[in-house]
Amino acid sequence: MGDWEFLEKLLDQVQEHSTSIGKIWLMVLFIFRILILGLAGESVWGDEQSDFTCNTEQPGCTNVCYDKAFPISHVRYWVLQFLFVSTPTLFYLGHVIYLSRKEEKLKQKESELRALDDKEQVEQAIAIIEKKKLKLYIQEDGTVKIKGALMYTYLTSVIFKSIFEAGFLLGQWYLYGFVMTPIYVCERVPCPHKVDCFVSRPMEKTIFIIFMLVVSLISLFLNVLELIHLICKSMIHALKKYSQYIPANRYPKNEDTYPEKTSETATAPFQDKSYIYLPMNENISYPQYKMPNEQNWVNFNTEQQLAISGNTQSPLGHYSLSAFLPVSPKTHSTVEKASTRASSSASKKQYV
């Protein structure tokens, strides 16, 4: 009775900490496998060896032929399959129990810290404990979220369950096939020749074999479906976690690419300026103007000639003082007229 209570608690733990597909798989495992196998397996396969007869009186021939026909009993083979398939789930359940015990220790330590008087140290220690609790992914009602290391454990258990299911299906096909033949031809020592052996209730056993085959295929399908579900869930969680690190305005919209002109952009390094574009032509002719220094030399030579003509006695090299002395109005007007004429003639020569 105590063993059944322990098994019931174990099943409750597995049911509580599994996905929806995992719960369906567990129901298929225990209802359609263990229950059916326990109730009908014994009645169908109870006379498996006693009713296996061969048409020979050679001692030991029937036993060796039975051993060759059935290396392992179907019922024992299915029990072994159940043990292998359920073992990864037990490992996952052990991880869940470990996390639950760890959370209980953290809660106990937190309650002990709250009883202390030093508030600062207590708050720091409680903050550290809360961070550790968050890493355990345990909710307030005691259920564990399948995240982090627990997700990898659950994913590994589903992978191994799928491998075991497929392996046992291949093993059953290799050992027995999926149809129970009524006559088995045996040729083995110590049988003197080929011996015909007869199986009891072959049709009933064939139906039972096909039923267990369908249950195994359903279990394998659920495992593969749950594996795809977990992989998609992990990818979505990783994408959401990655999108949190990308800034929202990393890629601005087209209308936000170029900011509007405001007073704040007056000191920007690049400002909009208006330019006048002149048409360019290869045959453009520009007027010939003298440079300012050439014009100054012309004016200087003209004034020098006027000074020489006005005062022949004092050359240019000896009138340094008289050149800066005040001139009478009459003389000034004469010089001005002469300079005007000279400049006009020079201008005419220039433009000619």
Curated annotation (Swiss-Prot):
How is this protein positioned relative to the membrane? Multi-pass membrane protein
Keywords attached to this Swiss-Prot or TrEMBL record, sorted alphabetically, are: Cell junction, Cell membrane, Gap junction, Membrane, Transmembrane, Transmembrane helix
The record's account of tissue expression is: Expressed in ovarian somatic cells, heart, leg muscle, liver and eye but not in brain.
Chain ranges on the Extracellular side, renumbered to this chain: 47-76, 177-208
Topology: which residues are Cytoplasmic? 2-23, 100-153, 232-352
Which GO MF terms are attached to this record?
A: gap junction channel activity
Record SUPFAM superfamilies: Connexin43
| Protein family according to the UniProt entry | Belongs to the connexin family. Alpha-type (group II) subfamily.
What's the name of the protein?
A: Gap junction alpha-4 protein
Q: Which organism is it from?
A: Xenopus laevis
Annotated gene = gja4
